Amino acid sequence: MRILMWDVHGGYTDSLLAGTDDYLFLPPEPSGRGGLARYGGSPPGNAYEVTAEELRDHPPDVVLLQRLEEIELCAQHLHRRPGQDLPAIFLEHNTPKTDVPSTRHPVADEPGVLIVHVTYFNQLFWDCGRTPTRVIEHGVADPGLRYTGRLPRLAFVVNEPVRRWRVTGSDLLSHFADFDVDAFGIDAELLPEAVRPNHERVSFAGNLKPNELYDAMAERRVYLHLNRWTSLGLSLIQAMQLGMPVAVLDATEASRAVPAAAGARSGDIAELITATRALLADPEEGQRRGLIARRAALERYSLPRFLHDWDLAFKEAAEITVRVS
């Protein structure tokens, strides 16, 4: 199939492009953002930049929407309305943010659109009205078993941990003041100062490229995941694939993603601290639990399963539009 989309979340785009469908992207904006600019002139073989004129002459089979403004972009460039005369999926990456659990989704009651959620928790908490929904759990390329746990430190991987303070559980780091924490990610350099004086042992470890990040994470003995109100983070899945034991706040989708034997999982911070201390003190036990984490992540979040689920979703979207048109 020919799928029109925008490169909104790079990691998610990469997973989709691992499949066999053709993905179409409008050219970059004047600012240089968008299109296939992120690939630096070497995009995957099934990714193409196409003009609006080409899309009008040869419309895509499905448009994959991730932002509301893309609905108007389709009307503007293709002269077609998603969900009416163009099969459409709205990929909802996020948890609802207001009036939970009664939050109305922006495309609720649009029977011609299929909403795809990334977790069952999100599907449960968004009110989508008459709009059909399905869940496609993440698919993550296996970075390989790399865990060494050489450094008795915690890895904490969060983008914008200060701006997203309570959402990402950054405020909870103060409870882990007895442990050395290495923070990775966009704007994570702001975190050490933000948590002082309650935590003096948080260090910025870099905003690294994926392969460098995997190696750096795998050297830390435990992965710490404190997200309070987010969809399931890709970095947690990647940590598990690396073979890291994980200490996880039991919120949103964590109980489905993380077996208790994969490290520690609790909504009780005191329990989580005790378990984290034990994992740091016993590298062999950490390695054993990390292998459990890896098996669980590979089984649930494999790329082949992810791509198969998306094939079904694209076909369903086309059928939905035919039924309502």
What do the predicted segments below correspond to?
Residues Y214, I237-Q241, T252-R256:
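Short alpha-helical segment that forms part of, or immediately flanks, the ligand-binding pocket
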Residues A281-K315, E319:
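A charged, aromatic-enriched C-terminal amphipathic alpha-helix characteristic of glycosyltransferases
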Residues E69, L73-R163:
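Catalytic core of nucleotide-activated saccharide and alditol-phosphate transferases
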Residues V140-P197, F204:
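Conserved catalytic-core segment of nucleotide-activated headgroup transferases in glycan assembly
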Residues P245-V248:
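Short hydrophobic beta-strand element within catalytic cores of glycosyltransferases
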Residues A260-A270, A278-E284:
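Conserved acidic donor-binding segment of nucleotide-sugar-dependent glycosyltransferases
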Residues R228:
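Aromatic "clamp/platform" in nucleotide-sugar-dependent glycosyltransferases that forms part
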